[in-house]
Amino acid sequence: MIMSIYKEEYKNVIAVTNRKLSSRPFLEQMKRVCKLHPRAVILREKDLSEEEYAELAVQILTLCKQYQVPCMLHTYLETARKLQHPYIHLPLFLLRENSENPGDFLAVGCSVHSVEEAKEAQKLGATYLTAGHIYTTDC
């Protein structure tokens, strides 16, 4: 009964990763997250090189598949293509740069911080949006 309550509670949550914030080993923490069955996971590890990201992505995709949690890869279009993964999430500047070429994905997400950005992302082909903070950050 308790687990079904958790599943219900997290069914609309999109978990965005930052392994530096986890006090547990990252894969252990991700297993705990996946067991709660969030709506999706966005693997957002901005400090990794594309090669490092690809290695981590393989592990996280396996874990997400095991728990039937959709996983959106973040930023690295070529990694997603090489892994034949159908979901990508892009910052708006990358969606702008690749608006002609994201068509091979089932879902293209975009992070937006204003209504104007949301409208632009939709015009550029985003199939879903995440709305974040509206103040300046380093991302």
Q: Model-flagged regions — what are they?
A:
Residues M1-H89, F93-L95, P102-T127:
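Conserved N-terminal beta1-alpha1 strand-loop-helix module at the mouth
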Residues L43, Y135-C139:
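A short acidic, helix-capping loop that chelates divalent metal ions and anchors anionic groups
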Residues T127-I134:
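Non-cysteine beta-strand/loop elements that form the S-adenosyl-L-methionine
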